[in-house]
Each structure stands twice: as C-alpha cells, then as structure tokens.
Amino acid sequence: VNSLVKEASRAGESVGLTVDRLAIDGGIPLKGRIEVRGAKNLVTKAMVASLLGETPSLLRSVPDISDVRVVRGLLEVHGVTVTEGAEPGDLILDPTNVRSAHMADIDAHAGSSRIPILFCGPLLHQLGEAFIPDLGGCRIGDRPIDFHLDALRRFGAVVDKLPSGIRITAPHGLRGAHIELPYPSVGATEQVLLTATRAKGITELRNAAIEPEIMDLIAILQKMGAIISVEPNRVILIEGVDKLDGYT
C-alpha cells in the first residue's frame, strides 16, 4: 500500500497522477470543516431566475468564476442591481428597475457564452422583448439554439433575425404550450421552465432533462411561487402564475 501511495505521490509531483489504481489505507476517522461553494451549473441559472421576481433575491455561496461574472454583467446592463451580501459569496439581486439593454452591451458582456438565450423568457415577461447577440455560431439553424427558439415560438414569441443578432418579442403575451423536446436538452428544459412559470395557462414539457441542476432550478422557482410538478417519463407540468417573488 505504502509503495503505491509513494508512487502516486511522485507521479503527481512530476506530471500528475498517472497510475490507474490507487490503494487507500483507511480506518482513520476524519474531521474538520470545509467550505463548499455553489455549483456553477445551478448558480448562473438561479441568477437568471431572479429576473422573474418582483422582489430582490438572495443567493448564497456564489463562486467567483467567469460564468458568474458574465451573468452578473448581463443582469446589470438590464437594470438589475447586484450587490454583495453580508457574508462572503452572498449576492443580492434586485430586478425592480429592469430595462432593455443595447445589443452592443449584451454582446460585450456575453462574449462567447450562450447564457443570454436563457434571459429571453424572463425578459419577455418583464419587458415584452429580448435580444440575443450573434455569438459566433449561435444562429438560427444551429441546432442547440434552435431548440430554445422553437420552444419560445410555441409560447407565442416572435423571432426576428437582425444583422447584429436575434430580436424576440411577445406582442400578445406568452401562453402555456405542449412541448416535446427532440432530446432531453438541459438548456432547452431550463428555457421552458424559465418561460412557462409566468405564461398564461398550463405548459406540458415532454422528454425533459432531469439532471440534478434541473431539479434544483425547479426547487428555486417553486420557492419563488411557481407551480411545477415532475411526472414520470420525463414529463414536467408548469402552471403559469401572475407574479413571483424573489428567493432567499
């Protein structure tokens, strides 16, 4: 055992762990405290979800990573006030003064990230329009974004291609829809959840993704006042509500 551990240690010090097996001599009780930051895949979507609330949200244990900084910048150009909380890693997100943003500002903050597509549902509810910059390959006809756009159209959104990106409007508001995804896409499932929670009527989503971050996003939306149930066989039902509150 000791020789294997020493071998792994030497390998790790030089070029990284290269052995295909590591023997651990257990039996020694472990104790202590570690700080666990929020999961990236959930934190950024929770930040976007704050746009749906009519009161501020408090998000705890936010990791200081590039994706979080991108979403923070996008929220701020849309008028959301983002401030540090009392504890390290706390963010307070206040959407009271949400407003439309210029395409150039969205593009500057988004970089190559596709996160702006998830802003569409919340912004359509709040402002009646949303913009997606040309993200280099993120275009109509590109399958990943097409799933999002097709879902938004099912809710009643109108999608227009502009030289600088995509403009999405909801001239008659958003209404519940029956949607079946071509495959259980995590991003498209998040899109439907973020859009359906305040759409009029009931949305039935079939072939939904059911990864842990989806369940966590559902829990956050439910905490805000959304009515969502997860059924067998990858079916999610969402009953739209008129208003949502912030989460803590």
Regions found by a protein language model. Give the residues of each.
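Structural preference for solvent-exposed beta-strand-turn elements
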Residues: 1-248
